[in-house]
Amino acid sequence: GGTALGESVRSLLQHDDAGQGMSPEAELLLFAASRAQHVRELIAPAIAQGQIVLCDRFLDSTTVYQGVARAIDSKKVETINQFAIGDTKPDLTILIDLSPEIGLARVHARSDGQLDRMEKEAIEFFQAVRQGYLDLAKSEPKRFLVLDGSQSVEELETQIWQKVEATFT
């Protein structure tokens, strides 16, 4: 998302009937295309102006969802990520960790039965995603802040702001 192209790709990936049966490789390349546009259209210009940029998801999502959970070779994912984002890399990544079972229960509670293509994946997929994120966080501990997602929103907010202020002020 974030750009007109990104929103179109997002719709295709999540809701469009044409996205059903999509190969892992096509999914990877579509996410990379969306991310490349997002970097060039929004992120890079903002950084060039000295702004702080917040993203809901970024290259780690591709590394984990397509590389780990979809079992695409990590070197290929890394190469495609590098091509898509260039030198743009987060200074801080906040990972709110939650068991897939609780996370999916929350998704179901808010969705009225209208799940997107990713949300319909089996629990094993989300277990692989979670482990992939935790492994990534372990490999880059200076960049990642891992928080227990079972805490209250207020507790999470306090911890996040403390880390953001320490990192960017």
Q: Which sequence ranges carry the predicted segments?
A:
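Short beta->alpha linker loops
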Residues: G1, S34, F58, L98-S99, ...
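Hydrophobic/aromatic beta-strand patches that form the interior of the parallel beta-sheet core
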Residues: L54, L92-I94, L145-L147
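A generic structural signal for alpha->beta connector loops
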Residues: G50-Q51, P90, P141-F144
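ATP-dependent small-molecule kinase phosphotransfer cores
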Residues: G1-I85
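A glycine- and Lys/Arg-enriched "phosphate-lid" helix/loop adjacent to the NTP-binding pocket
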Residues: S61-Q131
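Residues within well-formed alpha-helices
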Residues: P45, L54, I80, K89, ...
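Generic leucine side-chain signal with a strong bias for well-ordered alpha-helical environments
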Residues: L5, L28-L30, L95-L98, L104, ...
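NTP-dependent small-molecule kinase module
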Residues: E101-T169
